[in-house]
Design a protein with these regions (language model features):
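Conserved short alpha-helical segments that host acidic/polar catalytic motifs at enzyme active sites
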Residues: 1-342
Length: 342
């Protein structure tokens, strides 16, 4: 799983994005991290194996120009720097990040076939490796590839076909669905962020002349907001500093389990019991797994977990601390936020 943040507004995006990622990478990130911004019709990006501090130390991430951008950090898997987000299209016009899994669409979403088709069309997939990476597509030519990079290049093809970015994002998830949320920026739209959300979490906060998105509201800066909202599931969004365009129902046939007041109360009770019974602090993944219900559709356990955790932190009933675990390579460590009952 992963953490994502985005910003568009009237300030330099990079420092804001880095601050937001520091606030959330310990939930489900810290092993691969990257950032992308737009300025003067050009997409800039930087990425590393490591956490956000590694990104700042080893790249010019803090100095990337532009007032619109996205940032991403994720859990360990395998692969080198090319397995970090963002993924960038061959023409350099699109940067794409994603959070999620193929999940229940594994039998219908054929990323190996899509990847081979892209290769035939001349696309260069930089994440291709002869190493076998567990949980990621293995291609007929014996290589493994990050399916999110395949998504990025499929998005590029959809844009070449004449679709506008918002429509292209919808078509991407409609034709190659995953249990995920995808976010993109496009060089020709320097003041917009495009998102397509099936079930993984995405929240939106607004201030005067600014819009922020994040995996969890716990990542938002400490400032006054006009409003903070969860972006509804199974929909696509064009986000600007002063507006929001929506395409509902990426796929009307897909049912995402709603988070009703009753579901939230049950999750709050279950997480409370889990934390009270725990003999030592637990990572956020334990909170999220406790929220893996109801049945009968695609769950929103990550979003539900973040909403419950936010409630518990605000009430002062839990404490969040940070430990560091071994990173992807020797000498690197990753932050992990640990939750405990007071």
């Amino acid at each position: 799983m992963c953490n994502i943040a985005g910003y568009t507004g009237n300030r330099q995006a990079a420092p804001i994005l880095i601050d937001m990622m520091r606030r959330e990478e310990g939930y489900w990130g810290g092993y691969y991290t990257g950032i992308a911004t737009i300025d003067n019709g050009r997409v800039y990006h930087a990425k590393v194996v490591g956490d956000v501090e590694t990104l700042v130390r080893e790249t010019d991430a803090l100095r990337l120009p532009g007032t619109t951008g996205i940032i991403h950090s994720r859990t360990p898997s395998g692969g080198d720097r090319e397995w970090a987000y963002p993924f960038v299209s061959c023409d350099g016009k699109v940067a794409f990040v994603e959070n999620g899994i193929i999940g229940s669409f594994e039998k219908t979403t054929d990323f190996p076939a899509a990847a081979m088709d892209l290769k035939k069309k001349g696309h260069k997939l930089s994440s291709c490796t002869t190493d076998e990476i567990k949980g990621y597509p293995r291609l007929p030519d014996g290589t493994s590839v990050h399916y999110s990079e395949v998504q990025c290049h499929l998005l590029e093809e959809l844009l070449y076909s004449g679709l506008q970015p918002l429509e292209a994002m919808r078509e991407l998830l409609r034709r190659w669905p995953c249990e995920d949320v995808g976010v993109a920026i496009h060089h020709a739209h320097p003041n917009k962020i495009f998102a397509a959300r099936f079930n993984q979490p995405m929240t939106l906060a607004r201030a005067k002349g600014e819009a922020f998105i994040s995996t969890t509201p716990l990542a938002f800066p400490e400032q006054d907001f006009i409003g903070v909202d969860v972006l509804p599931a199974n929909a696509c969004y064009e986000i600007s500093a002063n507006g929001l365009s929506v395409i509902n129902a990426i796929d009307p046939a897909v049912r995402v389990c709603p988070i009703t007041p009753a579901v939230f109360v049950q999750a709050l009770q279950d997480v409370t019991a889990k934390l009270q019974a725990a003999k030592e602090p637990v990572p956020f993944s334990v909170v999220a797994e406790t929220c893996k219900f109801p049945q009968g559709g695609i769950p929103q356990m990550a979003l539900l977990g973040y909403l419950v955790l936010e409630s518990l932190l605000k009430s002062g009933k839990v404490v969040q601390t940070t430990i560091r675990k071994d990173g992807m390579t020797a000498g690197l460590t990753a932050p992990v936020f640990m939750i405990s009952w007071k």
